Amino acid sequence: MINTYLTIVLAPLIGSIVVGLGGNRLGRTLSHSITILGVTISTVLSFYVFNHHVLNEGEIFNQNIYTWMQIGGLNISFGFLVDNLTSVMLVVVSFVSLMVHIYTIGYMHEDKGYTKFFSYISLFTFAMFTLVMSNNFMQLFFGWEAVGLVSYLLIGFWHHKESAIEANLKAFIVNRVGDFGFILGIALVLMFFGTLDYAETFSQKDQIIGLTLFNDFSAITVICLLLFVGAMGKSAQVPLHVWLPGSMEGPTPISALIHAATMVTAGIFMVSRMSPLFELSDVALTVVMVIGAITALFMGLLGIVQNDIKKVVAYSTLSQLGYMTVALGVSAYSVAIFHLMTHAFFKALLFLAAGSVIVALHHEQDIRKMGGLRKKMPITYITSLLGTLALIGFPGFAGFYSKDMIIEAVHYSELPFSGWVYFAVVLGVFITAFYSMRLLFLVFHGESRVDKHTEEHLHETAPSITVPLIMLAIPSVVIGYFTIEPMLFGGWLDNGIYIDTSHESVEKLKHHFHSAFSLISHSVMTLPFWMMVGGIATAWLFSLYRTEWADIIQRRFKRINYVLVSLYGFDRLNEIIFVRGALKLGNLLWKISDMAIIDQLLVNGSARFARFVGSFIRPVQTGYVYHYAFFMIISLMLVLGWVLVASDYSFYS
C-alpha cells in the first residue's frame, strides 16, 4: 500500500512541476491533460484507499518513509498515517479538486496564465494531501504552510488588479498570525512530550494532566488553545476571518477549491486529528465551541447585505465553518467531519455555479443586475437550486443531515454556554436560508435586470463547466443519506478520533437517532425546520413579492445596516491598530535607531570625534623639517628606553 499512498501524494506534484516548467512549450491542451491526469490518478487511488480502510476495515497504516533529520534523540521524519479519517478526507479533497480542474478548462480558457493556473491548483492539491496524510507535527506544519503559500499565489493570480494583491497579502499576513500560535503549540508539544510523532504524543497524553505553565495555566489547555489559534487562521474563525471574503479576488475555480475542500477545511481536520489532546481540556473545548458559534451567527448576518454573488457564497462558507467548529467544541468530531464532507460538495457546486453565471454575464457579479436566468441557463439553475437546498438544510439533502446533527449535538452538550450556542446555531438556520434563497431568487427568478446586449447573447455555459456542476450536484443530494448511518452511528471514524467518556453528545445522538429516515421524520417537528421555512418565506417576500420592502427596512434600520455593511468594523480596526500602528512603530524606530543612533551617533559622531582629535594633532604639522627630525629623535629615544626597561637591561652591571 505504501506505493499507493506515495502515488496519491506525488501524482499532482509531478503534474504541477511538469506544467509549471514546460507549460508554454506543452501548450494548453497537453498542460491541462497532464494535471488532470495526475489528479485523476489520485482520485481513483483515494477511492481504492477508502474501500480498503473504511468499507473493508483495513488496518491503520502508520509508517515513516524516510528520516529527514536527527537532533539528539528527536527524529524528524516524513511518513503517512492513513486511517478512516484520512481516507474520507482523501476522497473529498481529490474528487472536488478533479471537478475544479475540469471546470477550469472552460472558465480560464481565455486567460493568459492558463497553464500556470493549472500548475498552481495541482500544487495546491499536493499540499493538502501532504497535510492530511502526515503522521507527525513537522510534516503537518509543512503541508500547512504549503497550503498557505499556494493560496497566496492563487488569490493574487490576477496580479494586475490592485484589489487582488491586497487580498492575497491580507490572507498571507492574517494566516501568519494564526501560524505563529500554531507553531508555538507544536513547540510546547515537543517540550512536554519530547516527540513530534502523533502516535507517540497521543500515547503519553495522560502524563500531561496536572502539569502547568508559569505555575498558573494548565499545560494541555495552553497547547490546545495555541493549536486552535492556527485553526482559527486557516478555517477563518472570528477574529482571524477577515482574509476569506477577500479571497474572492482570485479566479472562481480557486475560490471553490479553497472554500470547499482544501485550505479552510485544514483547521477542522487538524482539531479532529488532535482530539486526544483536546479531550483533556474542557476549557479549550468551550473556547472552540463559543468561537464557532460567534462565527456561525455573525458571519451569516453579513451574507444578508452582500450583493456580490461570490461574496454571498463566501460568507456562507464562514458561517458553515462556524458550525463545524461548534461540533468540534462539543466533542462531536465525526459530526464536524460529516458536515465538512457534505459542505465540500455543495459549496464547490455553488461557487462553480456562480462562476458559470459570471462567465455567461461577461464577468458581472452584482446580483442586483441579474434575474430571470433560469430560462436561459437551465443546468446552472437546477444545480444551483440543489446546492442551495443542501446548504439551507432542506430535509433529504446532504446538508440537512450534517447540520441537524450539529444542532442536536449542541443540544445534548453540558459544556458552559452551550445554551447560548444552541440559540446561535438555531438562529443561524433562519439566516442561512434567508441569504441563500435571496441569492437564488435574485439571480434566477423574477424579471431580468440584465442589460439588453448581454441578454441577447445569453446562453448556457460550455460542457466543461456544466459537467462538473452535475457531478457535484449528485453527492450534494444523496451523500448525506447514504453516509450518515455508518459515519455517525456505525463508527466509520472511530479509529481516527478519540472522545472522552465524560463527553456524551455523540452517544446521545446514537441513542436518539438510528437512521437517516428517523432524522427526517423527527425534523419536521423541530424548531430548526421551521426556522428554515421562515427563512425561505422571508427571502421570497423581500426578493420577489415586495421588493421595495428591503429598501424601506434598510433606511429604517440604517445603523444596523451600516454595522453589517462595514463588516463589524474589523477591517477598520485592523487598519487603525495594526496597519497604522505598524507604520507609527516603524517611523519611531526609524527616527531612534536609524537617524539618531546610526546616522547621528555612529556615522556623524565618528566624524566629529575624528575632527576633535585632529584639532589637537593639527598644531604639530608645522611644515619645518627640523621640527620633524626633533620629534623623530625624541620618539626613537622613548621607544629605546621602553625596550630597555621592558627587558630589565642595565648599563651598570
Locate each region found by the language model.
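Hydrophobic alpha-helical transmembrane segments of polytopic
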Residues: 5-12, 35-45, 86-93, 121-124, ...
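Hydrophobic alpha-helical membrane-insertion segments
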Residues: 37-54, 178-190, 384-392, 468-488, ...
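Membrane-interfacial helical/loop segments at transmembrane boundaries in membrane proteins
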Residues: 59-75, 197-213, 402-413, 486-519, ...
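Membrane-entry segments of alpha-helical transmembrane domains in multi-pass membrane proteins
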Residues: 1-10, 26-33, 74-92, 130-143, ...
